[in-house]
C-alpha cells in the first residue's frame, strides 16, 4: 500500500502539493503514481517563469513502462524546478515526497487548493482504480 502523507493535498491525477513558507507550493507525483509507472528514466519539467493552469499538462515523466503527462494541481507561475531530476530521475522513485519533487508554483488563485483532495479523499481515488 502506498504512503499518503496527511499534510499534503492531492489531485485525482496523482500529483501532490505542499505549501512552503514563502506562499508557494511544491508539486510532485505520488508514491502510488511512481509505483504504477515504474523506474523513471527521464523527466521533462516546465521552465521557471512559465505559467501553468490547474488541470493542464505541464511536465512529462518517462519510465521504462510509459511516458505520462504530469498535470498542474493549481494555477500559477513556476518559480523553481528540481534540476536534480535531469541527472537523477530515479529520485522520483526513491523519494516521491522529498527529493523527487518536480517544480514549485506561486499560485495565482489559492482557492484552487480547496478543490484538491486530502489524504483520505486521495486514498478513495486509488481504491476506485
UniProtKB/Swiss-Prot annotation:
Keyword terms: Lipoyl
Protein name: Glycine cleavage system H protein
Record family assignment: Belongs to the GcvH family.
Domain Lipoyl-binding intervals: 24-106
GO CC, any one term: glycine cleavage complex
Pfam family, one: GCV_H
Gene name linked to the record: gcvH
Subunit details: The glycine cleavage system is composed of four proteins: P, T, L and H.
Gene3D superfamilies listed in its UniProt record: 2.40.50.100
Cofactor: how bound: Binds 1 lipoyl cofactor covalently.
Domain of life, source organism: Bacteria
Cofactors (names): (R)-lipoate
Residues bearing PTM N6-lipoyllysine: 65
GO biological process entries: glycine decarboxylation via glycine cleavage system
Physiological role: The glycine cleavage system catalyzes the degradation of glycine. The H protein shuttles the methylamine group of glycine from the P protein to the T protein.
